[in-house]
Amino acid sequence: MKLTRILFIAAMFFVASAAAGWAQLHAASDGPVAYGHHHVNGTDLAAHKRFWANTLGGIPTAFGQSEMYKFPNVHVFVREREPTGGTKGSTVNHIGFRVPSVRATLGKVRAAGFPVVTRQELPPGVAVIDDMAYIDNQDTYIAFVMAPDNVKVELVEARDQEEAIALHHIHFDTNNVDAMKAWYVDTFGAIPGTRGSFQAADLPGVNLTYSGNPASLEGTEGRSLDHIGFEVENLEAFCRQLESAGVEFDVPYRELDQLGIAIAFFTDPFGTYIELTEGLDKY
């Protein structure tokens, strides 16, 4: 199983190297740990292509029966595998992208036939007009849409943004906000803070947002968002540091020499499956 995963990663990175440079992991040069990728399990690759490429504008790169979609500061990998559930109910409730106009992006989402779920995903006290909500404490408009296989996606308006779309945040659900936030701050060096009313922490390229949820939450592995990925400088030493802190790796550090890539996998204490990479920023 582990060998299959490694061969799969090798194949997808090889093909990805041909993609255009517009959607690279530019933030990877801004610190020793930056965000790298989302990895999705999907039942219909054509539907995922319509969402990630045709609708949101990611740059598609084919590798066998799978796809990768490149956005500024995040690559979205889609593997053909039936997920055990969507993002809701797992430790990663949704992923967020920033766009210059939420209204314009929603028009594309509707035209492509994907669900817009803003009203369903916000508390009754938050006003939703034309499927958009103005969030006063963030001074911006947001909306929620559903990608195939119930991957929940938030759109956050950034009016002055030059790119058509870029990574914005990962929104975690947890039974213990303080503990989860502290773990990501201590482990990855994220800068603690807030985002509006939410507890949060920042890494180059991404905001990590935390919400309390008293429900029983499942880990991400096997679900539609299988794992999240961080790009790490000097990954081998970083893995040794994590091991000394008690982290047990599902896939220990190893190098894929032919690609100049190194990888490792582990699960955080709250159930989120994480891949660490070094070299993904070159693709």
Give names to the regions the model predicted.
Residues 7-18:
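Bacterial N-terminal signal peptides
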Residues 1-5:
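Positively charged n-region of N-terminal signal peptides that target proteins for export
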Residues 27-29, 82-87, 159-161, 215-219:
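Short, flexible, solvent-exposed loop/turn segments with mixed acidic/basic and small polar residues
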Residues 30, 36-76, 81, 104, ...:
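Core segments of cupin and vicinal oxygen chelate
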Residues 22-30, 33-43, 68, 85-172, 194-196, 200, ...:
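Vicinal oxygen chelate
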Residues 45-47, 76, 83, 102-104, ...:
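Generic "edge-of-domain/loop-turn" microfeature
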